[in-house]
Amino acid sequence: MTNSLRRCLAAVMALCCTAGAGAQQRPLVVELFTSEGCSSCPPAEAAIGQLSARADVVALAWHVDYWDDLGWRDRFELPQSVKRQNIYVRNLHRASVYTPQLVIDGRFDAVGADGSAMAKALAAQRTSVPLRLSVHEAELLVDIGAQPQSPGCDVLLVPYLRHATSAIGRGENAGRTLEEFNIVREVRTLGSWKGEPKAFRVSVASLPRDATDVAVLIQPSGQGPMVGAAIQPLR
């Protein structure tokens, strides 16, 4: 794991440890772009596993497909992962996609991260949109409260698999068994939100069969800084 990624994770941990007293603080969203074919990714995956145990973090691992040429096809790869990463690369003024890339709250990534400056900025910007998730009679209920003067946002539903192990047969990780956490299985846009009270209903049966949990992200259109996030176990 690179020094910049270590600094980024240290800043996240420090911020989470100091944010607990704020009852209205929403969870911090930590997104990892990763691949089973990348030998630098397992330590970052382990960090996602640690973060996923925290109630004050929404940790998601997006598996990309551009490592396939090295001989191993990631069974969890999604075209949407690459699309999402490319938007962040543009927004964060990076030259190209890479793994492992850690994006924090849609605002920072690990490249050149200044840990103390990042933690301070994140703490100052963590607005909280009223967001409640529940499951009732095989339906996922998403209820968003009012938040005046909010930017136009997308409401994203992200089903994920909490934990998996994969035996890798080829590529950079050949011969290893990898532990993977909070693996994104799909992303769909439920609708838009502009600060008004809003509700969505989703049939649990319509979600990927291997999804164990869902995250809902409220994010300005174009993948701007997060304004809301919550998770809900499906079983």
Which residue stretches match the model-derived regions?
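Bacterial N-terminal signal peptides that target proteins for export
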Residues: 1-10
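Secreted/extracellular small peptides and ectodomain modules produced from precursors
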Residues: 6, 14-15, 36-39
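Cleavable N-terminal signal peptides
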Residues: 10-11, 21
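N-terminal signal peptide c-region/cleavage motif recognized by signal peptidases
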Residues: 16-20
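Active-site-proximal cofactor/substrate-binding loop regions of enzyme domains
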Residues: 22-92, 96
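G-domain G4 guanine-recognition motif of GTPases
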Residues: 63, 106-107
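Short, conserved sequence motifs used for protein processing/export or organelle targeting and
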Residues: 75-99, 107-235
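Ligand-binding face of N-terminal immunoglobulin V-set domains in extracellular IgSF glycoproteins
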Residues: 102
